[in-house]
Amino acid sequence: MEDIADFTLGITPYDKYRGHDKDTIKKRLFHSDTKIDSTYKPLITGENIQRYFIDNKIKEYIKYGEWLGAKREERFFNEPRILIRQIISGKPPRIYAGYTEESLYFTQIGFGIISKKESINNKYILVILNSLLMNFYHKYMYLDLEKDLFQKILIANCKKLPIREISLEAQQPFIEKANKMLFLNKNLQELSQKFQRLLTRKFELEKLSTKLQDWYLLEFSEFVKELKKSKIKLFLKEEMEWEEIFLEKKEEADKVKNEIEMTDKEIDGMVYELYGLSEEEIKIVEEN
């Protein structure tokens, strides 16, 4: 893959070998909760990097410039690019590769990729990286199969992933699928965040639990239990009203989620064909 793309690690904000003293490092002097001036850039976390899309919700800014430990090339924070989350998760563990054209900066929570060939589209690379086949390959080539938590994708290993070079015309169906996945995931994110804002506003919650953030994955009874954990008790009439709201919004989210899953399977089929897998080989990939 390093033959077709440029890579960068995330920013290293602080480095004692670059002259940063203990006070600067301890107080995180280059970080801020607000955009103080034009040198402060929006900083994402690993959670922002999802499969196919990058959540642009910002909690922090970083003062970007020569004073940083390692500032990296600025094009990796502004140009159309792929971002890979360093920590991979799930059962089986999956690569989280997202695409963005927004001005977003990141530290060592991941790394960036930009195609260095006009004949290779970033979105084509994105689809291959998120495919089941490439996840299978990465898992058995580079991961510790005995370890469940905190597995990582390393930039050195990503550079070795076998991305097939095909014509721009042949890439077009993959690019179209990438665009569809970007649209669907953004739609799901907006639906989810709208409901989260409703919960936060209605119940005056400072922060939602992880399960409440993923409310559309819950059944209504589980949703009520999560509210109770946040010390929110619904009276019978309120519960009936919330059940109607919850089920309506969950149905909307499920429709989008199902379309994402269906498109994912279509992509996997296209990638199997691209790499010439037999039926037996496909079965091995999908069962593992």
Could you tell me what each predicted segment is?
Residues 1-176:
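Polybasic, glycine- and aromatic-enriched phosphate-binding surface used to engage nucleic acids
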Residues 1-25, 47-49, 160-288:
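Non-catalytic DNA-recognition/assembly elements of restriction-modification systems
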